[in-house]
Amino acid sequence: MNTVKIRDIEIGAGVPKIIVPIVGVTKEDIIEEAKTFDSIPIDVVEWRVDWFEGVFDFAKVEDVLKDLREVLGNIPLLMTFRTSKEGGEKAIEPEAYAELNIKAAQTGYVDLVDVEIFTGDDIVKKIIDGAHAAGVKVIASNHDFFKTPAKADIIYRLRKMQDMNADIPKIAVMPQNKKDVLTLLAATEEMTTNYADRPIITMSMAGTGVISRLCGEVFGSSMTFGAAKKASAPGQMGVNDLNTVLGLLHDAM
């Protein structure tokens, strides 16, 4: 499998890399939180731009990106507009979604953008091509906050992301029971063993699925989300605890 190198971080090798989300509403909140990150173990910062009050004014978005880049130094920055249909804070028209992501990629301040794979193939391709042209990597994503699809369906979605040339396919699903967590882990193992030629990210959400956020190095998920202040999805552990567990598992493997 090929790894993905972003600044000093190599995704897909060794310990799963920790992504910490920022979900502030105001510019002040966002930058203040970012300033606390030098004291905690973070590999990538995700700015959940759908939470930002000025998200539909690109000049304001770029202003925050510029300051984030300055505060974060060499920490890679992922910008994500999570749409309301996939659990995010706001709705957005597909063309506006494409424009936001491509313009952000072109600023030079972001290292990755997140693209929801079922936005429509034309829009998805436009964003992936636009980001790549700007030297920015793409996480293609899919979220099911209600259920866990069948193993074959999870693998199909991840393979679709890979086929559309996303750098890192990502899926997050909600377990209704413990067996659903096993389904997600089995899909992860099968995808990485049989199909993936690049890193993937998978997780089973909520408390029931928390084990999936810890065992990525065993089954093949290359990144995991930890909360510094406010979790952006159910089941996220605090980043310090997450880092400790990932390290203990890595050392024992």
Range-by-range predicted roles:
Residues 2-4, 14-133, 143-147:
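Active-site beta->alpha loop and helix N-cap motifs at the rims of alpha/beta catalytic domains
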Residues 7:
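Glycine-/acidic-rich phosphate or pyrophosphate-binding loops and their flanking alpha/beta elements
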Residues 112, 117-253:
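Catalytic alpha/beta core domains of metabolic enzymes, predominantly
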